Amino acid sequence: MEPLNHDCGIVMIRLLKPLSYYQQKYGTWQYPMHKLYLMMEKQKNRGQEGAGIACVKMHAEPGEEYMFRERALGSSAIPEVFNTTYKGYAKNYTREQINDPDFAAVNMPFAGELYMGHLRYSTTGKSGIAYVHPFLRRNNWKAKNLALCGNFSMINNEEVYNELIEKGQHPRRFADSYFLLEHMGHRLDREVERVFGIAELMGKKNREIT
């Protein structure tokens, strides 16, 4: 058996049914958010210094936001993150709108199909909200977006940092999670462009491809 260590906590939930299903079965479309909270609380004893959540809407239309993130620092970071989200609901929407899963799916943040949670335990000595996962890499092309959280500590940061520079990038911070995000993003960009080119040769139109 491996020894017990202080590690980051990670949660991921992928819904296979629409929000209306959870509204009908559990009385609220926010059921996956409640599960996310519970699963993060069960990992709280890992000594986290901060917490963050992210959500992706898989069926958003152009002009609609589809990636959301909330982060906080401190021992009460988990309830703070969720309370901030719920207070936003109460401030910006009516009770009828909040209880309508179809309205929420289109208009409300954190009403999506993919949820991610992270509890940060620092192994590098660096702290601050900028180091709390999930990390986001945003792009107007949906296929090029990334949300990343992990439990790792790279020992070859200088080498990975220099690889990014050699690729022509200009890293904006020195952090292993950021390096990994940009390396993955670089490869994702290349792959999306490769597949896009193949689809164009097959006669498909831009929006049809994406």
Q: Which residues are covered by each model-predicted region?
A:
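Conserved short alpha-helical segments that host acidic/polar catalytic motifs at enzyme active sites
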Residues: M1-T210
